[in-house]
A protein has these predicted regions:
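Aromatic-anchored segments of alpha-helical transmembrane domains
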Residues: 18-26, 73-81, 120-129
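Short helix-perturbing small/polar motifs within transmembrane alpha-helices
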Residues: 23, 91-129, 179
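Membrane-interfacial segments
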Residues: 28-36, 61, 65, 85, ...
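Interfacial aromatic-anchored transmembrane helix boundaries in multi-pass membrane proteins
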Residues: 30-34, 38, 74-102
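Membrane-embedded alpha-helical hairpins and interfacial helices in multi-pass inner-membrane proteins
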Residues: 39, 114-187
């Protein structure tokens, strides 16, 4: 009975934290989307501001399933709203890699959880990859989605092929910064959850 109650409590906690992550993603996305520079910074901004939620998700639930669900959710939204449907092809591997890294530290090793978050934060790149691999189709879908030609022209000009690795490295860096501040801000909560 106790195990069942604990399992139910973990499921509720995971649901709340996944929802909080999704809201963080959605709010940053809504603010970023019309502005080219913010649009390209979006994976980095989400990595930074969602870090506390991610670390609490690991600490409170120790759930592999929760990590994968959180990773995939934004890509499902992208596909559901008519974006080019390759987003899950990046989100799923990112979630699985993040899950194995966190699991390797039994979800309580803060260093491994930090590395896990770095790879987890690549989950959004499925929405950006078409800028390079399906360039014309991407800009057509953006126009159909209601953004203007000037947005497309600016993003096109700012995204030579070398910008992709720059964005990935930037996301890793912002993820590290987010994890650093998480440890500073939520230190007591993480300690009480047994995260070292």
């Amino acid at each position: 009975m106790k195990t069942q109650k604990k399992s139910s409590k973990n499921a509720v906690t995971a649901g709340v934290l996944i929802a909080l992550y999704f809201v963080t993603y959605a709010v940053i996305g809504a603010i970023s989307m019309p502005v080219p520079v913010l649009f390209l910074l979006m994976p980095m901004l989400v990595a930074l501001f969602a870090a506390p939620t991610y670390h609490m998700l690991l600490a409170k639930t120790k759930s592999a399933t929760a990590i994968v669900i959180a990773a995939i959710l934004p890509s499902i939204l992208l596909v559901a709203t008519g974006h080019i449907p390759i987003a899950p092809l990046v989100a799923v591997p990112a979630g699985i890699i993040a899950m194995f890294i966190a699991k390797g530290g039994n979800y309580i090793d803060f260093k491994k959880n930090t590395i896990s978050h770095m790879f987890f934060s690549l989950n959004l790149f499925g929405g950006f990859l078409p800028i390079w691999v399906m360039r014309e189709a991407f800009f057509e879908s953006v126009i159909k989605g209601g953004l203007d030609q000037s947005f497309c022209n600016t993003v096109r000009a700012w995204t030579p092929i070398w910008m992709l690795p720059v964005m990935i490295i930037g996301t890793f860096i912002f993820s590290l910064i987010g994890s650093y501040f998480t440890k500073k801000i939520l230190n007591k909560k993480l300690e009480s959850a047994g995260v070292l």
